[in-house]
Amino acid sequence: MIICKTPFRISLFGGGTDFPIWFNRNNGMTISFAINKYCYLSLRELPNLFPFKYRLRYFINETSTKITKIKHPCIKGILKKYHKSHNGLEIVHSSDIPGLSGLGSSSAFTISMLKLIHKYNKKNLSKDQLVRKCIDIEHNMLHESSGYQDQYACAYGGFNYINYNKNNIKVNKIKITKFNLENLISNSILVYSGIQRKSELIEKDKIRNINKNQENLQAILEISKEAKN
């Protein structure tokens, strides 16, 4: 059995400047940190004693005889692209936090799934490779509308500021003293409101209005720079 975990993230500054439609014409910067709450995925080969080839357990239980008949879009997409053997698989998901909570759960799931299937294929991926494959799955296969900060924050972990431009994306570790880190933690409260929403609708609205909001996004970028300093 292979088990992978990926942290969720809290975004502090710069949201909206991590969209390609923005940073391909302007610069972008986000500041975020990973937290000690995780998305867990496990994978094991399924014995060929069952009337199905794939058994999935997430918020529902699902069985399927073919990858193309799997209902979960992310699992189906990743298996279709990277699972080349004929072995049956069981994949189980669990999480410290409910989905749709605004903490990067979608990207955390995709990153975990990519780590899982590549470990199964006996291949190691760098953090940058993980991010690029995650973006490819989410944007090109699942056609999701999202920025890039969640993929980087979940794959890299830690406390970082991320610079975006059309030629390069760079993750920079924020150097913070133990005292200041403990001060930040002791003065922060993470509360579950019970409200769940699909970020896809919010992100599509951001992209649709990005030309109208250029002044606001530029101001968000300047605030991010000030916060970094």
Give residue spans per PLM region.
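Short clusters of hydrophobic/aromatic residues that line enzyme substrate/ligand-binding pockets
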Residues: 31, 97, 103, 162
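DPxDG-like acidic metal-binding loop motif
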Residues: 102-123
